[in-house]
């Protein structure tokens, strides 16, 4: 029993150190401000980030470059590393933002999340992939933010 308590406290300390280290990473935004589509994406990501923070998530990465792609938001929810794919639309006239995430994109996000976990030696951490859909001009005239936890296969 003492060994289990010791192992648990070591794991807890390591997770706290990870959270602190990830929080201090330098965050860069590679999109040009003259790119209207990029500006729309950034606006949606900011809405998603505010929403997740209100839920108690700790944001540890934004537009994190991994391998040959990027992950929109990386957060910690309790003891789980959460990789968030953010999809933004100005309105819902041409479909829901989630409808733009096909099988290829799902596989790509899952591969990027697995690469991130390997890069940071987090193979033993719980992880999941969430989708945050942002419709900027929702029915109420305000942005509508929808959060889908564990939206598709998490990294192996």
Regions inferred by a protein language model and the residue ranges of each:
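Solvent-exposed beta-strand sheet faces enriched in polar/charged residues
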Residues: 63, 87, 130-132
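Domain-level recognition of nuclease-like catalytic cores that cleave nucleotide substrates
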Residues: 5-6, 119-156
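Mg2+/Mn2+-dependent nuclease catalytic core
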Residues: 90-116
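Short helix-to-loop capping/linker segments positioned immediately adjacent to catalytic or ligand/cofactor-binding
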Residues: 60-61, 117-120
């Amino acid at each position: 029993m003492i060994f289990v308590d010791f192992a648990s406290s070591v794991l807890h300390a390591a997770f706290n150190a990870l959270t602190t280290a990830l929080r201090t990473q330098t965050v860069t935004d590679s999109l040009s401000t003259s790119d209207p589509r990029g500006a729309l994406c950034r606006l949606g990501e900011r809405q998603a980030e505010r929403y997740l923070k209100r839920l108690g998530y700790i944001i540890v990465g934004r537009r994190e470059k991994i391998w040959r792609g990027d992950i929109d938001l990386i957060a910690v929810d309790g003891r789980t590393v959460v990789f968030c794919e953010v999809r933004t639309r100005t309105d819902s006239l041409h479909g829901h933002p989630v409808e733009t995430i096909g099988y290829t994109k799902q596989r790509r996000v899952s591969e990027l999340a697995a690469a991130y976990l390997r890069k940071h030696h987090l193979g033993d951490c719980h992880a999941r992939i969430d989708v945050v859909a942002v419709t900027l001009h929702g029915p109420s005239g305000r942005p509508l933010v929808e959060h889908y936890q564990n939206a598709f296969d998490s990294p192996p």
